[in-house]
Amino acid sequence: MSKRFRRLSHSIYECKYHLVFCPKYRYPIFEGEIKAYTEREIEKLISQKEGLEIIELNIQSDHVHLVMWIAPKYSVSQVMGYLKGKLALRRLSRYERLGKQYWGRHLWGRGYCVSTIGIDETRIREYVRWQEKKQKEIEQLQGKLFDETE
C-alpha cells in the first residue's frame, strides 16, 4: 500500500486538513515561551490520539496553522474541540496573566477555518471518468470470457 494512505481496521484513508484558529480578540499572545509551550502542547495532544498526526505546524503571533491527518473516526469539529479545550485549560492555568486578558476562561475565538488537502478537482474528475471507462472494458472482457466458456 502506498505511503499516501493510512489504515484503520476496516478502511484506508487519506484525510488531510489545513486548520487555522485564533485566540479570542486575535491578541498577539504567541511569542517567546508561550509560543514554544503551545507548540509542545499541540504536539503532545495530537500524539495522544490514535489516528491524528501533524504534518506541519506553524504558530504566528496571533493564530495557529496546523496541517494534519485526521482519521475518519474523528470529525474535524471533535478534533478542534479537543485541541482548543485542552490548550485553553493548560495555558490559562500555567500563564495566569492570560486570565486577565481572557476573562471567563475563554482563550480561543469561537470558530476556525478548515480546508481539505488532496488531489485537485481536475485529477479527481479524470479519475472518475477513467474508472467508468475501465469498468466497461472489464465488463466487455468478462462477457467475452463468459461467451467462450459456453
Task: Locate the predicted segments by residue.
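Basic nucleic-acid-binding interfaces
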Residues: 1-150
